[in-house]
Curated annotation (Swiss-Prot):
Transmembrane segments: none annotated. It comes from Streptococcus pneumoniae serotype 4 (strain ATCC BAA-334 / TIGR4). One of its GO terms (molecular function) is lipid binding. Keywords: Lipid-binding. The keyword Protein biosynthesis does not apply. This is DegV domain-containing protein SP_1557.
Length: 282
């Protein structure tokens, strides 16, 4: 089996993984005040948050290019590939997953699967990494898909946003609820539900209590089994490092890493947002 792995630029990937010849990353363009950017090409994460703060309206992200995906899939057979696996951002935040399902049976001599990851950002990047590890240890395509299904079902992220007004602009919270929330110092904890949709998990008074609750949730959720935990932030590195230290102090093991939200999730949640993602080691 020669396996090609696809993902999109919403995945948080290490420089080492990005250099692999059998990895194909589809760009997700972001439009900020009429200018189009692609993160990692002509836009860094830091620049994105700077531009978003100065923009007259929220940035808009597009779906990855189906034409580009088709072009690469068409070329795979002559490169000796026999299988292709696409791990893209959750169907709960993008229509791309639904829009490409017709392609699975369109390429003769190529076995293709596009599972719904129900997640994005750093956990999505770790899924990609896991697939390469399983392939390298000799797993066949069916076994990789089975392990991936287990991993997807036990992966999520819990999120605390810094600015409720940003959720209003994105249509995730009413203006009245945001005004009341700001007055009462309410910090809603959001999460990726089992449909891969970002929704409110619970509401907590004050950031300090919300941070403590985030840690409790992750500790409860990852109590059985081995997990990788990632602190993901929207241009808030100091807050993220502080939370990482809290997690280590609470005994969540040594495998707690840091990552940044890119433009896709950053647009939804705003600067200062912070999340705890978790994914099982299989």
């Amino acid at each position: 089996m020669k396996l090609a792995v696809f993902t999109d630029s919403s995945a948080y990937l290490s420089a080492e993984i990005l250099q692999r010849e059998d990895l194909f990353v589809l760009d997700i363009p972001v439009n900020i005040d009429g200018e189009e950017y692609v993160e990692g090409i002509n836009l860094s994460a830091e620049e994105f948050y700077q531009k978003m703060a100065q923009a007259s309206e929220l940035p808009k992200t597009s779906q990855p290019s189906i034409a580009k995906l088709d072009e690469i899939l068409t070329s795979l057979k002559e490169q000796g590939y026999t299988h292709a696996l696409g791990l893209f951002l959750s169907s709960g935040i993008s229509g791309f997953y639904q829009n490409i399902q017709y392609m699975v049976d369109d390429y003769e001599g190529l076995t293709i699967a596009f599972p719904d990851t129900l997640i994005t950002s750093a956990p999505l990047g770790i899924m990609v990494e896991s697939v390469f590890n399983w392939r390298d240890q000799g797993d066949d395509f069916a076994s990789i898909q089975d392990k991936l299904a287990i991993q997807i079902s036990r992966t999520s992220a819990f999120i605390m946003v810094d600015d409720l007004d940003h959720l209003v602009k994105g249509g995730r919270l009413s203006n009245g609820a945001a005004i009341l929330g700001n007055l009462l110092s309410i910090k809603p904890i959001l999460y990726f539900n089992d449909q891969g949709v970002i929704e409110v998990y619970e509401k907590v008074r004050t950031e300090k209590k919300a941070t403590k609750r985030l840690i409790e949730i992750i500790k409860e959720t990852t109590a059985s089994g081995q997990y990788r935990v990632i602190v993901i932030h929207g241009n808030a590195p100091e807050k993220a490092e502080e939370l990482r230290q809290h997690l280590l102090d609470f005994g969540l093991g040594s495998d707690v890493s840091l990552a940044t939200f890119g433009s896709v999730i950053g647009t939804h949640l705003g600067a200062g947002s912070i999340a705890l993602g978790y994914i099982p080691v299989i």
